């Protein structure tokens, strides 16, 4: 076990994760985080549009249920339940939900703005 682990939180209760509306129809909860990564859950209503944006964090996601059109750079794909994706840091990306979706994302390093809410 790493010595710095003593100062890091290692367990997170799901019912303690605060839900934040990012844009209409897009709700986020930060489920857990450590020194080098952050885990987030997104509940996306059909028609929700997360506009094109970028951030310096690498992002890996998994579609638990539903579907969405995901644009990463110049490539657009339909992602359905069971699909996953990788978005390199600083690459513009956008998501438009086709049907209600539950998506899990990991960010590295952790997004500071997601630690606040």
Question: What are the residue ranges of the model-derived segments?
Answer:
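Conserved short histidine dyad/triad with adjacent acidic residue
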Residues: 24, 40-54
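Short, conserved beta-strand element in jelly-roll/cupin
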Residues: 43-45, 55-70
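Structural motif
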Residues: 67-69, 76, 92, 102
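Short acidic-glycine-tyrosine-enriched beta hairpin
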Residues: 74-89
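Ligand-binding loop in jelly-roll beta-barrel domains
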Residues: 89-113
């Amino acid at each position: 076990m790493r010595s710095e682990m003593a100062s890091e939180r290692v367990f997170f209760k799901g019912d303690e994760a605060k839900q934040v509306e990012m844009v209409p129809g897009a709700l986020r909860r930060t489920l857990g985080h450590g020194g080098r990564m952050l885990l987030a859950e997104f509940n996306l209503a059909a028609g929700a549009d997360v506009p094109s944006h970028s951030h310096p964090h690498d992002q890996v996601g998994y579609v638990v249920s539903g579907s969405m059109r995901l644009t990463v750079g110049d490539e657009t794909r339909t992602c359905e339940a069971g699909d996953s994706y990788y978005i390199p840091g600083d690459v513009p990306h956008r998501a438009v939900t086709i049907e209600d979706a539950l998506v899990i994302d990991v960010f590295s390093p952790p997004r500071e703005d997601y630690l606040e809410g």
